[in-house]
């Protein structure tokens, strides 16, 4: 009991709020503490992710401290003190809040019927609760010129209330000082320096922060109202982190994608690629089955598929790491049914061999426990935007050193760039470098993040990451950042990379959803092969080499389980019903499995999701049967060329993103900005 009382004396203080006594943590502001107690204090400028500004004066509370006079203070900047008395709803506060709302409405246009923020506007809600029912303004309203903010954000600056959330978001989270306030007094306005567009990997989140309709989404403008939309939960399938999202749709059309709060992954943010990925499903789509470029029926295509599978000729199925765990599981079962069938991946052999179960870290553990972070062949600002944001937040609020082993590139994190080749990096991790040898020995919070994109480079294949990392005492497990949404699941399924000999020996080649990256596409185009069946959602250069092309159901028409970079299983939910023309990989593979009743495993297939999600499978590797081998011992085979970054463009990092007009426009604006700087 003594320890418990001492704990509360140190960590907790007693305060009085609205004549009720509460115990609350130290070092909390009055606004944060009241929110923790479930008491509502109105605000406009305060946000949990940003620093305190105190611009709006809407969060006023009355404070009584001992014998001092009772006075109103700003609750977002006032910390809780012991024996403090706080009043939240006095006549003085009601009048002050009404005056603040009236002042904000003096120059605010009355265009709520045409505003995209209507129904979700903080100014509307707080005017109804705290505002007055009459107007004393008899002058003309001020007009402010709209700024060109790029292809994502639409500005109507006459609605701006100068909360400066967007300014602080750009400076503190994005690391760019594009926005700021100009002029003074009544003529104050938010503007961008040199009229630069808002271009960042997280710039779409500014719209979510804006409490009024000054900043809205350009693709969403004048399309629908928020109360007309249905909402479904899902995950981001554009990177390996798997951010949680809300999908807003009406009928058969997706109108916008918003972040879902998940403190372990994406917090309250999502990348622009995740926000506008749905636009790629509207362009360059396969809409009907094709036979040598001409339309054909689905039944005839299924007959040809069944005929090819049942023949004794060798078949090759090529897939990538963007398909779900259920499809990978069914592909494994298909090989047990048909001995003439081989399943290969387009992922390089290096990635498969260097992955093992122990090399799986956690994003939260790396961010919280690391004091020195090593980035190997990784551009976080392109390949994992949200992890880059978390490391930047750690750097700004605590001590964190970031060392990037790659050539120099623009980043919003303060990093030390060390341009080494794979051989020198191997010597460095062994402690043969004076500076880093001492750093590895003395640093308690040492963490490592490995990129997957630049590991395609020829010559790094002999670098055994496994053996190197076993000798280093990392504070957390190293983390591999993949390129696709199920890159960890593809590694655990132990699919081997295809070779040129596999393609030449196969009679028919099946291609399943092959649009992962430009590297894999180039390798397939250079391979002399005849593709028999092409299954995908979009056209591609490989589709021209296929005899049969079948449209696949989009990611929003199917559900599936995906493993993110932490090997965390997450469910992508189905939003729309699949039409009669498109094909689902689940249904296609189950159809092929059902034609052999003597080996029917449908009682087993009905439990496939529970089997895949069983934690013991990932711990013991019962089905996947993954083994780690040491294959790199000869330093002569290691490349002597320095590592170079491959992914420079966040918006077009995958082939599917190249079909989105919104992301293409973002990429063009980014290239224009880079050309102007140099």
Regions found by a protein language model. Give the residues of each.
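Active-site phosphate/pyrophosphate-binding segments
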Residues: 301-305, 399-402, 406-505, 599, ...
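N-terminal leader/propeptide and maturation segments of large enzyme subunits in energy/redox metabolism
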Residues: 110-139, 576-623
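Phosphate/diphosphate-binding loops
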Residues: 202-259, 368-400, 405, 515, ...
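Cofactor-/ligand-binding subdomain signature composed of acidic, glycine-rich
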Residues: 138, 248-313, 368-372, 381-384, ...
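N-terminal mitochondrial targeting presequence
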Residues: 1-10
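Fe-S ferredoxin-like electron-transfer domains
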Residues: 57-236, 241-245, 253
